[in-house]
């Protein structure tokens, strides 16, 4: 029987394929007394060998998607599997206690995990504990004969169904086989959504319970355009979805013709369309989609994909590659934004009641613990500045004094490099992200000291509305077009322009087709979005009149009380 679910349309596109459930299996087992210890040893050896082969395959695929350094985590996992001491201890438990391989494996690995986790002053050993946990799950799954999901090993067309997708999950996805994904939780601004748009994979998020309704291999039809997911679609419904997919492909072909065109409105006004990236590999997509700049380079992925703090030289090479890849076009680099939901296995973050409101981003950089990291990153950026048009911005700034402190460290490192005879570019612009309401309200004072603003709407909206963007129960409060949000944004843009500075936006709102006309009217200078949204936004801007959009935004700011009123007004002015 056909069932239809409605979720959040998070990444455009249409797909019809079999479901691949990316859910953790039940790995519970009973401890059994056994007589044939040789057979248990053989079962263990077979599970270890199969796990080793799987991890090698996963690593080989991860090298192509993540790069050699990031994929090295799988080397650590394979070293655990190949550890003769651990294997010998597991076999000793099998023989001494006459228990099944599952029980012996758990006893020995739990012992090692406990020892390593107890070394609180040794980040390397704590990281090994995490490796053992991951490897134990894989070996246990093979002993129990249950499937452990491995996205990297998918070799047929599927639609991923999951509670949510982690950065490591999405990094393993092969677009050739993964045609879409659907999750229980998440929204348009969640990591899963952003990655889906970057990879150009259709996605529907926030369905609440799809993992409970779908079985492995069940046929699904997914529309990232409407947010619809159909379980067991009829032949007629499959045909409708295929037609919708063809229509969307034709639309994309029309947009592709604008790749080398200027972003100019119907009345001749130019706006800068930029793209957001997470790794140097993303630059190719930026250029393929005709972006005029990079408005946000999320450098924290350099840290998250490494096994230890990236060195100054490692970072220099990454920043150099991005700047050279953009051939002189502007690149805005955000200094590391660690904390919140972005953790590092080799850097201890405190357990906090509200990590998104806690010790993160620039707050870490300005601390004693983060000072060395921050200076290393700034030195690498300054060294790379000679390879392109670099702009630097600091995230999570609430106070003018925070910006001054960060700028002071920047100036100190710049002076040191120059004294060492290291070339540094002239005229590097240094700005801040506006993502905290306090900074948005005080934009007029910040504008006197910074070179530019980049509005980070993903956090600005959730902080202003006091609504966790990942919490489905309060998702109705996450309103990009709420008049309160629009007034904050307008305040920031006007404050920048009053001091002769420029204002950009790097949140997902910058590529939102309802928000773009409003932002044009407010005078936003740079729109930075997922690279795959650039051409669609250029197409929209080319048919709009900037003067008319000024009327629209003025009316929305002065007359609208609700998000619904704003949306209706945009529809009236853009139809």
Swiss-Prot record:
It is found in: Cytoplasm. Gene3D superfamilies: Phosphoenolpyruvate-binding domains, Phosphohistidine domain, PtsI, HPr-binding domain. The keyword Transferase applies. Keywords: Cytoplasm, Kinase, Magnesium, Metal-binding, Phosphotransferase system, Sugar transport, Transferase, Transport. Mg(2+) binds at residues 435, 459. The reaction takes place in three steps, mediated by a phosphocarrier histidine residue located on the surface of the central domain. The two first partial reactions are catalyzed at an active site located on the N-terminal domain, and the third partial reaction is catalyzed at an active site located on the C-terminal domain. For catalytic turnover, the central domain swivels from the concave surface of the N-terminal domain to that of the C-terminal domain. The N-terminal domain contains the HPr binding site, the central domain the pyrophosphate/phosphate carrier histidine, and the C-terminal domain the pyruvate binding site. This is Phosphoenolpyruvate-protein phosphotransferase. It comes from Lactococcus lactis subsp. lactis (strain IL1403) (Streptococcus lactis). The gene is ptsI.
């Amino acid at each position: 029987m056909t069932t239809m679910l409605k979720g959040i349309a998070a990444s455009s596109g249409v797909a019809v394929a079999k479901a691949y459930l990316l859910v953790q299996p039940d790995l519970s087992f009973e401890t059994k007394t056994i007589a044939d210890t040789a057979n248990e040893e053989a079962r263990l050896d077979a599970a270890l060998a199969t796990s080793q082969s799987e991890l090698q395959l996963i690593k080989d695929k991860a090298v192509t998607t993540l790069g050699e350094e990031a994929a090295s985590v799988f080397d650590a996992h394979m070293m655990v599997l190949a550890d003769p001491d651990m294997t010998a201890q597991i076999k000793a438990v099998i023989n001494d206690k006459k228990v099944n391989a599952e029980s012996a494996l758990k006893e020995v690995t739990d012992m090692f995990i406990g020892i390593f986790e107890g070394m609180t002053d040794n980040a390397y050993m704590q990281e090994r504990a995490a490796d053992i946990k991951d490897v134990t799950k894989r070996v246990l799954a093979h002993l129990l004969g249950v499937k452990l999901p491995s996205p990297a090993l998918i070799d047929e067309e599927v639609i991923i169904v999951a509670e949510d997708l982690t950065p490591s999950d999405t990094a393993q996805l092969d677009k050739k086989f993964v045609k879409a994904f659907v999750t229980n939780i998440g929204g348009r601004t969640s990591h899963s959504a952003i990655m889906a748009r970057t990879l150009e994979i259709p996605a529907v998020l926030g369905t609440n319970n799809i993992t409970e309704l779908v079985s492995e291999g069940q046929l699904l039809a997914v529309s990232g355009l409407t947010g619809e997911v159909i379980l067991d679609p009829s032949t007629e419904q499959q045909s409708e979805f295929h037609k919708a997919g063809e229509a969307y492909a034709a639309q994309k072909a029309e947009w592709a013709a604008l790749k080398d065109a200027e972003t100019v409105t119907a009345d001749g006004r130019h706006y800068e369309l930029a793209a957001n990236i997470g790794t140097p590999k993303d630059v190719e997509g930026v250029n393929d989609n005709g972006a005029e700049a990079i408005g946000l380079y999320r450098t924290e992925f350099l840290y998250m994909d490494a096994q230890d703090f990236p060195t100054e030289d490692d970072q220099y090479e990454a920043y150099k590659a991005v700047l050279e890849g953009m051939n002189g076009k502007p690149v805005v680099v955000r200094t590391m934004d660690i904390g919140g939901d972005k953790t590092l296995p080799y850097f201890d973050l405190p357990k906090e009641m509200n990590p998104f409101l806690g010790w993160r981003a620039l707050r870490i950089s300005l601390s004693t613990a983060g000072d060395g990291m921050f200076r290393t990153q700034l030195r690498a950026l300054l060294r790379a500045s000679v390879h392109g048009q670099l702009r630097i911005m600091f995230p999570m700034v609430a106070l003018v004094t925070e910006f001054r402190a960060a700028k002071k460290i920047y100036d100190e490192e710049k002076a040191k490099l120059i004294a060492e005879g290291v070339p540094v570019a002239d005229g590097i612009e240094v700005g801040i992200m506006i993502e905290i309401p306090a900074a948005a309200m005080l934009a007029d004072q910040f504008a006197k000291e910074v070179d530019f603003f980049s509005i980070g709407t993903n956090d600005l909206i959730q902080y202003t509305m006091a609504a966790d963007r990942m919490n489905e129960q309060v998702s109705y409060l996450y309103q990009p077009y709420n008049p309160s949000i629009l007034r904050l944004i307008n305040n920031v843009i006007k404050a920048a322009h009053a001091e002769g500075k420029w204002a950009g936006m790097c949140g997902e709102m910058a590529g939102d087709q309802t928000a773009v006309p409003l932002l044009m009217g407010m005078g936003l200078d740079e729109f930075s979005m997922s690279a795959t949204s650039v051409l669609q936004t250029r197409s929209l801007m080319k048919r709009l009149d900037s003067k008319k959009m000024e009327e629209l935004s003025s009316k929305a700011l002065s007359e609208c009380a609700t998000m619904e009123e704003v949306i209706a007004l945009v529809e009236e002015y853009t139809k």
